[in-house]
A protein has these predicted regions:
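Detector for outer-membrane/organellar transmembrane beta-barrel domains
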Residues: 265, 297-402
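Outer membrane beta-barrel
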Residues: 98, 103-223, 254, 433-435
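Residues on the lipid-exposed face of transmembrane beta-strands in outer-membrane beta-barrel proteins
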Residues: 93-99, 138-143, 194-198, 247-251, ...
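Residues that define the transmembrane beta-barrel architecture of outer-membrane proteins
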Residues: 85-91, 132-137, 144, 188-192, ...
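N-terminal periplasmic/intermembrane-space "pro-region" immediately following the signal or transit peptide
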Residues: 18-86, 92, 96, 100-103, ...
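Transmembrane beta-strands of outer-membrane beta-barrel pores
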Residues: 61-69, 113-117, 145, 156-158, ...
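Repeated loop/turn-to-beta-strand initiation elements of outer-membrane beta-barrel proteins
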Residues: 55, 103-107, 147-150, 202-205, ...
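Outer-membrane beta-barrel "beta-signal"
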Residues: 176, 432, 444-458
Length: 458
């Protein structure tokens, strides 16, 4: 019954529809006598064919290496040597298309083609052969009229005020394939959805429906996050129709925004367990749950304060069964919050901080006798970002720090992007990681990655 009420709420918006001084009459502004061509200050002629004008292309070449030889601790207590090696050696072509082809209509799409060269982990995973990949990112058609807008296609929906680590940013799936992608903005995967928005004075109502929910893809073989699973991880077998739906109401007040939201979602991460026979493909389980949230911000001069709160009902967590050998899942409730701020130091410098904490509620009531949790009851992380635009915007410094609240794992990144011309840019980056032995990032402890990316936009 609660899901029917939520869907009805999502569908409701579809039915709502200086004074000039006098100059002498004989004043002559002619340039004929000083030899200046009439078209000297004319804008450059655009020779781009009309059919190509909606397109933007970016061709990039990337090289990144783990450059710190060191040893790491293994699960059995021993240590293993880790040599320096090339991790990413790839070329990519990013294509963007944006065409407002008629009043109130917009067609937008983007896709990427990648080639993996010798040295890249994708090359090694492909048995030392050059590999290729194509991915369609976004592809949607938007219709806007009056105070309403409808979008249909592959797109993202982002909830929450905090950028980068909000507890409400859970609608789209994500893929952190390697350490070149450390920001959620770059890791989000588009999903096929219908999204509509309607504006009423100082407030906005937006809703979405997803008739084919997808799940986070497993780590790519050879990537820094890959581990050899005990059983083969296959795609989720859909034995019934799945859907997601959500709605959000947002009020804009003087210096503040407040939003309330509700959604019926599937967890982005599948839960895996051993097959009954002990051989073959792992069993995958998708958990559906109800999300209730509230978010707010407050602007005070150059400071913007953000707060997001999420309550999740019937989230699945992994447990060890009473027999001590089998694993399973139980449904629990979870409460989480993200508090942070954005501060504009000046016109060139910005600072962002967000802290997230989540806790499982009354787990003892959900666990059967003899069962125990295989996950932490309390988790949290912090995100710090600093950016500085130098040399009239030609040089951009970006610093990122991510850490678990207990400092069990820490990642730091420093990037410099230098604009060589209107079309050419060079980005250099250093990424360092530290992790405790019992952390999921323990294999990355002590790593130092150095790299560069050369990009040509046309």
């Amino acid at each position: 019954m609660r899901y029917r009420i939520l869907i009805a709420a999502c569908l409701l918006p579809l039915g709502l529809h200086a004074q000039a001084q006098d100059l002498p009459d004989n004043l002559d502004f002619s340039l004929d006598g000083i030899g200046i061509s009439n078209d000297l200050f004319a804008p450059d002629e655009d020779n781009t064919p009309a059919w190509l004008q909606p397109f933007t292309f970016r061709l990039s070449q990337q090289l990144i290496a783990q450059s710190n030889p060191h040893s790491i601790s293994l699960a059995d207590g021993s240590r293993a040597e880790k040599n320096a090696y090339v991790e990413n050696h790839r070329s990519s072509l990013l294509l963007r298309y944006q065409n407002p082809f008629a009043p109130g209509w917009l067609l937008q799409a983007s896709g990427q083609v990648k080639l993996y060269w010798p040295g890249d982990y994708e090359y090694r995973a492909n048995r030392d052969h050059i590999d290729t990949e194509f991915r369609l990112n976004e592809f949607f058609l938007q219709r806007s009229e009056g105070n309403s807008s409808v979008k249909l296609g592959a797109q993202t929906v982002v909830w929450g005020e905090n950028i980068g680590n909000s507890v409400l940013d859970v609608i789209n799936t994500s893929e952190f394939r390697d350490l070149t992608i450390i920001d959620i903005e770059d890791a989000r995967l588009n999903q096929w959805m219908l999204v509509w928005e309607r504006f009423y004075g100082n407030h906005q109502w937006s809703s979405f429906v997803n008739l084919y929910p997808e799940f986070n893809p497993p780590p790519v073989r050879g990537s820094p996050f890959f581990f050899e699973p005990a059983f083969n991880l296959t795609d989720y077998r859909r034995d019934k129709a799945l859907f997601e739906a959500g709605t959000q109401m947002r009020w804009s007040l003087t210096g503040s925004d407040i939003s309330v939201m509700a959604a019926y979602l599937y967890e982005n991460q599948l839960h895996y367990s051993a097959p009954p026979s002990g051989m073959g493909n792992a069993l995958s389980e998708a958990g559906d749950y109800l999300l209730l949230g509230v978010s707010a911000n407050r602007a005070i001069g150059r400071l913007l304060l953000n707060l997001d709160i999420a309550y999740s009902h019937d989230i699945l967590v992994d447990v060890m069964m009473a027999n001590g050998s089998d694993t399973g899942t139980v449904a629990v409730r979870k409460l989480g919050g993200t508090a942070g701020f954005e501060y504009a130091i000046d016109n060139e410098q910005n600072l962002l901080l967000g802290v997230t904490a989540e806790t499982l509620l009354k787990t003892d009531e959900a666990l059967a006798p003899g069962q125990r949790l295989l996950v932490d009851r309390h988790t949290g992380n912090a995100l710090l970002r600093y950016s500085n635009s130098l040399r009239n915007g030609d040089l951009l410094l970006s610093v990122t720090m991510q850490s678990a609240l207990d400092a069990a794992s820490v990642l730091g990144s420093v990037a410099l992007q230098y604009t060589l011309s209107n079309h050419l840019s060079l980005t250099t980056q250093a990424i360092a990681t530290r992790a405790d032995n019992d952390s999921a990032l323990a294999p990355l402890d002590g790593d130092l990655r150095l790299g560069m990316t050369l990009s040509w936009t046309f």
